[in-house]
Amino acid sequence: MDILNQIRENADAFSDRPAIISENGSVTWRGLYDGSRRLAERINNMCAPGSRAPLVVCGHKSPYMIMSMLACAYAGHAYCPVDISMPAERVADIIDAVSPEIVLAAEESALDLLPQDGGFFLMPPR
């Protein structure tokens, strides 16, 4: 069984139980599944039709970082995780090397490290 199917099954069986608990927040199995599926839909709507280009997910140890990575997988995209503790120059180099269609900011503080030329949005959707 793959991880995406297991998350769906856990959402059905344990919907209100915590899937992720961290000092930066928590999310239930249902929240993890539904949130990552909604974000996957947004990714597919923002990317070129049929695109499977890699994406960058920028954040730090939050449930939304994991949700963003799962969303990339649900949308059929590879992803490159980037931690906000990295120097801004290194983050820029990674983004240049990956050339993603979208950079997902898994938390607001990640926006400070990202280029200001568009193509990214804050997770969770507000």
Where are these regions (language model features)?
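Carrier-protein-dependent adenylate-forming modules in NRPS/ANL systems
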Residues: 1-126
